[in-house]
Amino acid sequence: MTLALHAHEFDAVAAAHDVAPNLEGRAAAADRGEVTLAADIEDLHMAGLICAPLGVFAGGIGLCWEPGAVAAGVDVLRVLGRANLAVARLFEGHVNAVKLATLYGTAATQARVARAVRGGALMGVWGADGARPVTLREGRAGIILDGGKRFASGLGLVSLAVISATDGNGATRLVLAPADDARRADESSWKVSGMRATASGDFDTSGLELDFDALLGGPDDYYCEPHFQGGVWRYAAAQLGAIEALTNAMRTDLAARGRLSDPHQAARFARAAMACETARLWVREAALTVEAPDADPGSATRAVLARLAVARAATDTMVEVDRALGTAAHFLGHPVERIRRDLSFYLRQASPDDALHAASLALAARAGPVGDFWTAP
């Protein structure tokens, strides 16, 4: 079914709340590999969320990036992450891909993306190279790709992927490529403890021939800020949802045992709730800063710090949950066990110490007192 939204009538957060029970209800089976996330993606489409990241001009609301739809984007990712972090991860990649196609695609490419997404197509961004990094060269009628991607999320679910590739001059280019050829996908390498339901793995692009319109933007546009590192607030919003899910599960378990009134257990719940709210404020403010129409490259620092703040909140909350519930939360089938595995895996990032160091240097170079870093002219 092809959808188009009425921007002034569509409530993305309400739509996320509507589908959340279905996503949560299927999460355990998806983690065990008994079902795929196909039904979840269809639910997102029928609720209007798949086309929501499209610009208003294309039948969406610009969810997560257009003014007026950024705060809603934070809450949508948070609600989805609370229901099933694997689904939220795929949706975040979809939002990122739609935004990149809108930022850098030709008019023809944007129209193609809009048609596909309104029809329910899930998009993704695949940036991690495999043993043979993806390269591109020009052919007579377009470009030809070679090499492969790893950690490609949503194999069998993603229809169009934004893929990074190195051109003959050593620059990174973005390419919009079809991703639904099962012969090119290989999930066998995805032997991980968390985020198993994302159907990730390797994707071989060798010999893939595409029109020149498949190129998005110019050389190294992929790394332009605040759209590159600045976009990590979306990861953090999804992760925050999982932290909230852990906190809710702790409260439910303690209440069932009649232990929520115990002063030590109540304090653990309160500390977890405080961590959630602190993280939420970090993410919301980072999103509004980065996605502002006049955002400068330096605003990406706030998003990096928000992601690190969420990682700290996650670590602190997992400690509180472990102390509150003990061994019960480590039994297979307990909601906390699965959510913790997914969250712990998703939190992993390359060189977090380097990210913190770079952010600290950027902060130190700012003028004015600490409390005015983000508000001073």
Tell what function each PLM region has.
Residues 241, 270-277, 304, 308-315, ...:
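Generic structural signal for well-ordered, non-transmembrane alpha-helical segments
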Residues 192-277:
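Glycine-rich beta->alpha junctions and the first turn(s) of the following alpha-helix
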Residues 36-46, 50-153, 157:
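Glycine-rich flavin
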Residues 328-377:
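Glycine-rich phosphate/cofactor-binding loops in nucleotide/flavin-utilizing enzymes
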Residues 3, 7-10, 227, 234, ...:
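Register-specific recognition of a single heptad position within extended alpha-helical repeats
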Residues 151-185:
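A short core secondary-structure module
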Residues 24-32, 255, 278-309, 319-330:
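C-terminal helix-coil-helix/basic helical segment that borders enzyme active sites and/or dimer interfaces
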